[in-house]
């Protein structure tokens, strides 16, 4: 008996046709419905489940049984018994509600062949539209604002009192690659501090340098070079103040940037399609057996009643 529902399920999967799609936004309610083609047979039970292996509910007459932590507060069953259309309403959609929903009808013939159970299955895809980026993404990427930058040219430097000659090396462009995020740092001028050991005079030129980031945000980096002329030689030191530290959270390899999940769902249920079909078949068999027992009991009772009436007349 269990092979028949499995065979019917395989046949329905082979001849499956592309199913319709329903698109909703997060927080909305989605109503899914499907019609059965066989309008002559009697519906024993209807069911809804979500692919790949999450059963939602089973409905027999006026009784509705929910599975896999689904409740009527989340998904309401809005179909009268033995209707041509079965309908459910999913309330307050979230990204996890997206996926393929399947409705199934289990029907029996209205003739005397009560052992035959027909099975119909229809699919509907629910798409839940999510926002393109979250608030955290906007703050870290700086895509919603473009800070103003200012550039100050160095004043004239008078090194006439210096007793020695020194050279200042211009730093090469620095490229910081973190996964797909690239920051290109370009220096146009440096802040130079020159100290003469013989004269004791010093001149200072400070210029904030713009750092161009490919993600529409700009920060400044100030580099200072100090050159001291002594009798033993020339000593050059470097100090850096990097405003890009404000974006350490974004560039940190240990930090995972926030992501928005849309259109994908994962089910952790242990149910399989084969189990659903077996449950449907067993339940249908139990219901049919109960109907048969009722009919036999009614027939025997009716027969005795007629016999009793006949004896009384005589």
From Swiss-Prot:
Glycosylated; contains phosphate and sulfate-substituted glycans. O-glycosylation is required for hemagglutination and hemadsorption activities of infected cell membranes. Residues 17-278 are virion surface. SMART domains: IG. Keywords: Disulfide bond, Early protein, Glycoprotein, Hemagglutinin, Host membrane, Immunoglobulin domain, Late protein, Membrane, Signal, Transmembrane, Transmembrane helix, Viral envelope protein, Virion. It comes from the Viruses. Residues 17-121 form the Ig-like V-type domain. It holds the Pfam family V-set. Residues 193-202 have a biased composition (Polar residues). Gene3D superfamilies: Immunoglobulins (2.60.40.10). Residues 1-16 form the signal peptide. The chain crosses the membrane at residues 279-302. Residues 303-314 are intravirion. Residues 193-214 are annotated as: Disordered. SUPFAM superfamilies: Immunoglobulin (SSF48726). One of its GO terms (cellular component) is membrane. Induction: Expressed in the early phase of the viral replicative cycle. Disulfide bonds join 34-103. The keyword Disulfide bond applies. Glycans are attached at residues 37, 69, 112, 161, 253. It is found in: Virion membrane; Host membrane. InterPro entries: Ig-like_dom, Ig-like_dom_sf, Ig-like_fold, Ig_sub, Ig_V-set. It is a single-pass type I membrane protein. Belongs to the orthopoxvirus OPG185 family. Heterodimerizes with OPG040. The heterodimer OPG185-OPG040 interacts with components of the entry fusion complex OPG143 and OPG094. Heterodimer with C3/VPC protein; disulfide-linked. Prevents cell to cell fusion by interacting with and directing the viral OPG040 protein on the host plasma membrane. The OPG185-OPG040 complex associates with components of the entry fusion complex (EFC) presumably to avoid superinfection and syncytium formation. Via its interaction with C3/VCP protein, protects the infected cell and probably also the extracellular enveloped virus from complement attack. This is Protein OPG185.
